[in-house]
């Protein structure tokens, strides 16, 4: 005599299959042999059990997916895996332009302060470009020139934090997701009563650090903001209670001001109102944050490169990181010959050289790199 299989099948995760398996299992039990499993009450209970099982199975599957860089779909998961490979994601990038500024004055020297704002107009919308460092120049006879000044589109922002070592959850965040980390300056003031300030540099090679190294580290958080953090006193210098951390950076509109070519000066610079501005190179380089797909591609390649450029893939990865607005890049060694644009063919080998061909997402004269 045939007997019913009383085991519950657990291989299916689809809702309908889960419900069918539950129904088959319960029908095989003596306690439920006279039950109507199509009745409204029992049917609702089976639906509830099936939905719960389906959700648990789905969540378990998604959890497993997020454990690996290749299959992760959440940005926070991808960024976390990239960090374990020593890869820093690329933030939003501000368009930048180069200008010459001349101040009509007989003063011996003048200083253009960081945050000095210039304006431009694109399609009826005004955009602000700012300097990110103090620059001092001397008089040449009739004017004080500031040559090849780099200006970045956006608002120059300062975020300040007072260090509290008893707060284990304290974080030093760039407070806007549109922050351009390439413009970041990190300073640490001793205390509110001691205004002595030290400028920290970004750590690039921990093997060169000591317990006194004044460096900072940067990472993208799960909220999409960037966080600055510091050493523990063994690997680079640790912060002390009462220190004031000052983060200065540009918050940008990303790609909107690419191509800006004409800039208006502020009303005055260091007390001088006679200002002439000449554009050296148009605004370019504005880009959105690095995409999930780009992180998945570049993080393993960057890890393989180990901070040096030797292979073709090493150069490709570094180029994309150095110029986020790169749409496509081709790299070849000098042993393969240089490319002659006039003839469209490769010439004789040039040993000891690497050639890089870049297609940009915006206007840019790459030969000026």
Each predicted region: which residue ranges?
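Signature of Asx- and small-polar-rich beta-strand/turn repeats characteristic
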Residues: 1-369
